[in-house]
Amino acid sequence: MSKICIIAWIYGRVQGVGFRYTTQYEAKRLGLTGYAKNLDDGSVEVVACGEEGQVEKLMQWLKSGGPRSARVERVLSEPHHPSGELTDFRIR
């Protein structure tokens, strides 16, 4: 499989519920690099890079609601080309 990067925006009750940290754990478990960060509008932005199948697994996890404490209402995503190399999955 080829390597890909996506950027996703997750909306709903996704801040203050451990969403970024649980996403980081899941992404690292899948061998992905990238980041998760809170945005001012209450959403979370996630960039994930790695094997296509693993990125798709993370996207499915996000769309299925992420951590139990969160309530995901909507996930938008598109292909992404990061400006620099991502060597780990971080919280921003």
Swiss-Prot record:
Family matches, as InterPro entries: Acylphosphatase (IPR020456), Acylphosphatase-like_dom (IPR001792), Acylphosphatase-like_dom_sf (IPR036046), Acylphosphatase_bac (IPR028627), Acylphosphatase_CS (IPR017968)
Cystine residue pairs: C5-C49
EC category name: hydrolase
Keyword Transcription regulation applies: no
Annotated keywords: Disulfide bond, Hydrolase
Gene Ontology MF term list: acylphosphatase activity
Keyword Hydrolase part of the UniProt annotation: yes
Assigned EC number: 3.6.1.7
HAMAP family: Acylphosphatase_entero
Family: Belongs to the acylphosphatase family.
Protein name: Acylphosphatase
Originating organism: Shigella flexneri
Lineage: Bacteria, Pseudomonadati, Pseudomonadota, Gammaproteobacteria, Enterobacterales
Gene from which the chain derives: yccX
